[in-house]
Amino acid sequence: MSGTCVIGLQWGDEAKGKLVDLLAPRFDWVVRYQGGANAGHTVVAGDETYKLHHIPSGILHSDVQNVITPGVVINPTTMLQEIDGLQARGIDVFENLKVSERAHLVMPWHMIEDATINATAVRGESIGTTNRGIGPCYRDKVGRTHAIRMIDLIEGSRDERIATVAGQKQVLLKNLGASEEELDSIAPEKMVALAASWAERLAPMIADTTDMVLDAAEANQKMLFEGAQGALLDIDHGTYPFVTSSNSSGVGVCAGAGVPPKWINQVLGVCKAYSTRVGGGPFPSELEDETGEKIRKLGNEFGTTTGRPRRCGWFDAVAVRYTARLSGVTRLALMMMDVLAHFDELKVCVAYELDGKEIHRVPAHAEQLRRCKPIYETIQGWNTPVDDARSVDDFPPLAMAYVKRIEELVGIPVGVLSVGPDRAQTIFTEESKVMGL
């Protein structure tokens, strides 16, 4: 089997969805393996723009089978809204999307819990939650007692199970300070009716995706694994506690999708030509000045899911080298090169200064990373638009010098360059041929 992963190497929002959409026709399957509706993928196809949260970006290609595997947590209401939006635009989602019976459900009580707990944030600073209930759902998944899975929707004991957990959650959330209105919204009878409505529509899509994926792999079919968020948000390896609740780096692919490591052949690490972050947490190369604001405006850096303005900064080679090594990246995709075409001078963070010492690693403790001062290398900008570039030969020499320097600092060749949101604004370099792209 040929398995290729698309992994974000920063704090998410690296334009992974664009690449998955572009690469999908070359594969038989697109597999979404972690995260939930907290992640947003934007795909631009001609005059159409699609904003996807649950559904794999391969859904825009009718001859590609899309699957959502056990590592994903699903809000059925949100997913059905997403499905209805796509169906209204002529995309037959039910025909080529299957959802794992093992996937856990984000229930209405999870969103109440998310907002309530986030009100008492770390150091008064939000950990970056989208209040979509993702963290509490993963917490229940690990705790097991209150977890609801997709298969529970179609089992005979559904109503009893839902009613029992809803009643228990009312008690727990009351103790956390939830309002009477919030508690009433998750009354057992309301949750039972809601689950029944979900089951009626989703039942045809629920399947044993683990068995499907393994059968396809053994039949030597080509698979594209689509990650959500970015590796710096990984629950185990990211900038903890300002992280997500799943393994968003390359280490999460096999567990989330249910495939053995031997079937992952290539890993495409996606990063912007600069850095962005949403929500709280340390960000060594952040620019809290007019340069950062210029990047935000040029890159339209506002969250797909929340609409929140993203924090912007220079490219952090220390962080990207770390996540690229962690994820086993074989080639880089350097996105948003068009944004940097408006600067006379660029900077790249090549090391940190921590308590007077130069370091070349990402500290495990958030407070240590917060104390890190970026050590920059200045690179001459090209200050020439590259939006119309369709090959490496169309790039100004100074732009290619920037690309080469990123390759040197990260230690991995660049296989893809992006100069805009449209599919046509994507350039595959000679290095991409190694991946069979």
From Swiss-Prot:
Keywords: Cytoplasm, GTP-binding, Ligase, Magnesium, Metal-binding, Nucleotide-binding, Purine biosynthesis. One of its GO terms (cellular component) is cytoplasm. GO terms for molecular function: adenylosuccinate synthase activity; GTP binding; magnesium ion binding. PROSITE patterns: ADENYLOSUCCIN_SYN_1 (PS01266), ADENYLOSUCCIN_SYN_2 (PS00513). Pathway: Purine metabolism; AMP biosynthesis via de novo pathway; AMP from IMP: step 1/2. Its EC number is 6.3.4.4. It comes from the Bacteria. The keyword GTP-binding applies. Coiled coil: none annotated. Gene3D superfamilies: Adenylosuccinate Synthetase, subunit A, domain 1, Adenylosuccinate Synthetase, subunit A, domain 2, Adenylosuccinate Synthetase, subunit A, domain 3. It catalyses: IMP + L-aspartate + GTP = N(6)-(1,2-dicarboxyethyl)-AMP + GDP + phosphate + 2 H(+). InterPro entries: Adenylosuccin_syn_GTP-bd, Adenylosuccin_syn_Lys_AS, Adenylosuccinate_synth_dom1, Adenylosuccinate_synth_dom2, Adenylosuccinate_synth_dom3, Adenylosuccinate_synthetase, P-loop_NTPase. Binds 1 Mg(2+) ion per subunit. Substrate binds at residues 304-310. IMP binds at residues 13-16, 38-41, 130, 144, 229, 244, 308. The keyword GTP-binding applies. Its cofactor is Mg(2+). It is found in: Cytoplasm. Belongs to the adenylosuccinate synthetase family. This is Adenylosuccinate synthetase.
